[in-house]
Amino acid sequence: MVAAVLLGLSWLCSPLGALVLDFNNIRSSADLHGARKGSQCLSDTDCNTRKFCLQPRDEKPFCATCRGLRRRCQRDAMCCPGTLCVNDVCTTMEDATPILERQLDEQDGTHAEGTTGHPVQENQPKRKPSIKKSQGRKGQEGESCLRTFDCGPGLCCARHFWTKICKPVLLEGQVCSRRGHKDTAQAPEIFQRCDCGPGLLCRSQLTSNRQHARLRVCQKIEKL
């Protein structure tokens, strides 16, 4: 008799226990999904470090974890710190630098072809729109340029990160770089300097300090 009662109770409790387990599984999966989605956002600035604002088609935007190396991307903010979005793929800074520099050179070539009357290729990357200077006005220090002719007196057009800006021509005693000289492939010259001013030459310092001897500075040309 007792065995029959216990068997009946176990039969009644089994469905109830299964329902409790199913409910717990559903709740834990929902919590995990919510934690993975993160908080809602309007832009990347609303998210914490190593997160970006993901905007799905059928859902509200939310903060998602940044994407690692060689993952698909649409902008730099989607990639984790230390990487950039180049050609829709998260790429290291070292690998991205030569690619971006090559694109800049191609953009400069495209602009030159357009001014000489040759057709511009459609597959060339488009230059970001910039504020046009009034006709005849030369660029001031820090303003964007394409060539030194675009800059005012005492300035030259030199590379600064992934663009070109007007920078001051170097004076006597200022650190300089040999014209056309490039650093190693791991550290390309993305901060170009202007040439030395008139009557000056870029050459190594004459000093007993080995560390300072490696520096090249603008010096007066000695008359023979």
Curated annotation (Swiss-Prot):
A Pfam family: DIKK1-2-4_C-subdom1
GO CC terms: extracellular space
Coiled coil (UniProt feature): none
KW Hydrolase (keyword) present: no
Residue ranges, annotated region (DKK-type Cys-1): 41-90
High-level lineage: Eukaryota, Metazoa, Chordata, Craniata, Vertebrata
Location of the protein in the cell: Secreted
Family affiliation: Belongs to the dickkopf family.
CDD domains the UniProt entry points to: Dkk4_Cys1, Dkk4_Cys2
Biological process annotations from GO: negative regulation of canonical Wnt signaling pathway; negative regulation of hair follicle placode formation; negative regulation of Wnt signaling pathway; Wnt signaling pathway
Protein name stated in the entry: Dickkopf-related protein 4
Leader sequence residues: 1-18
Biased composition (Basic residues): 126-136
Comment field on protein domains: The C-terminal cysteine-rich domain mediates interaction with LRP5 and LRP6.
Keywords per UniProt: Cleavage on pair of basic residues, Developmental protein, Disulfide bond, Secreted, Signal, Wnt signaling pathway
